Amino acid sequence: MRNRKPWLVLLLVAVAGLLLFVWRLGMTGLVDETPPLFAASAKAMAETGDWLTPRVNGLPRYDKPPLVYWLMGLGYALPAQDLWNPFGTWASRLPSALSSIGLMLLMALTLLRRPQGQPDGAQQAVTAMAAALAFALSPLVLLWSRISVSDALFSGLLSAALLLFWWRYARLCRWWIPWLVLGLAVLAKGPVAVVLAGLTALLFAVLQRDLPGLWALWRPWRGLALTAAVALPWYVLELLVEGQPYWDSFFGYHNLQRFTGVVNNHLQPWWFFFPVLVVASLPFTPLLLAGLVGALRPQPAPPEQSLQRFAACWLLAVFVFFTAAATKLPSYWIPATPAAGLLIALAAQNLRPGWRSAVLRGSTLALVGVLTAGLAAGNLWVPLINEPEMPTLSAALLASGALRRASLCFGVGGVAALLLWWGPSSARRGWLLVQQLGMGAFVVTALVPMVELGDRLRQLPIRRMASLALEQQRPQEPLAMVGILKPSLHYYTQQVVVYEGVQPNGPLNLNDRLAKEQRRGQQPSPASPGTSVLVVIDGNTATLPHWRGVPHQRLGTIGLYELWRVPRPALSQWSKDLAERAGLAPDWQEPRPERY
């Protein structure tokens, strides 16, 4: 029996997505360290008209293909930025938010067009909404859908392509549509999209014992040609323009080396994604595991009833591939979260009276109870938080009341779900959805305010320091940042910033780079009498011996950060003295896989 009002279900899903991902989206600044690099690259595209190569802080940025930069850049190209986009975050975050909302709608539509099992109309609506919300309420999705990076866009496009592959198997779309979307996924993050799609398809074909049928339906050779036609033109143009540096960085470092070696010290044990799977689906992890086990039964499923099995293969493909990779990050699990949402909702729909259902519901609500109690007891564990960049975080978080509101939302949702569970059979179908509504209220009333609190404590000092630097800056005076490196300083000052870390030869590097380094927006200049450099430095770095002795004038202090004016001749002399005393030398020209 088909739901007679699918548009109403989709409308409710869209409203939920807007509340979860768009509500107050642009009311906070960029979050260091990665999002400002994306935002600055996209803004540079819009301002310079160079839509081929992303560039940040005067250097090419080769780590991701251009689609996310193009979409962000379209936002930055709109007029009246100061009115609607004061922090630069509406334009840079909307692609992530809209990608997740679009995926929620596609998941719900899939379950409305091809209901799994024999649910009545009301159960179809509940399952469709529950699947979309189980995906959207994953902690990983809530976080990455509201920041300026490419993960949510990539996950949305890859997941849409995978769902459309299943649509083709269920005779719901033409063969070429999923391949077209897969090409966009390749433009969002690279060839890993094809690898994950291929691994999912292979696992599904093996479990369904229908490789010839799937091959005929999906037409992989023609499909891969279409995917290549969508994605390859940009890659070819980029290679022609940028040459070997692009090949070495994107394909060599950011793709091959991330799989075969550890990048950026992201070394994790082989079992890393087991706890990630558990945490990413809380508090519905018992339902996810039940849905996964139920999907792997040996007998093949009819094509139109095989969505649960397809979702299981999808989740396992992500798990196997990234477990095999040497570099592991929690964000690598995001492409599996839509599959987890489908498995959770279908497992809840398939619950029947008996001890097994009681255990699954009971364990899920027990996890809700644990989360409720943990949030209510925040005064016991929040003071243990030690964040050097936000020393007042613990006190501010407790004073905000956000944890009490969070506990209330989880608790009310859990009690409502328990009452429905004990109620008449017609009401039991809504127990999962009611709990999800409580979690949605948590996002709006507690999580978003906590994010805004973190912005005031961590990012506002950087924005204020950027304003101070612009006020104090003399004509042609360069700007540097040492110690804690914040790319948002580059974004908010809209100029090249020379970044140096805490290493002892930092002053030597800074002096040498000002005299020799050339990049877009920065020309080398001699340390002539009367020249100076503005330096943003954090308080801890300022106490280190190799920086403490640098002659400077302190122009202001904001939070952890100080603004110095350093005479260039004095910096040059200090660097020479430091080199002689400690035997140090500049090393900024040595090859580095990532630089900004």
Where are these regions (language model features)?
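Membrane-integral, polyisoprenol-dependent glycosyltransferases
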Residues: 1-357, 557-564, 572-578
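Membrane-embedded architecture of ER/inner-membrane glycosylation machinery
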Residues: 2-3, 7, 176, 294-596
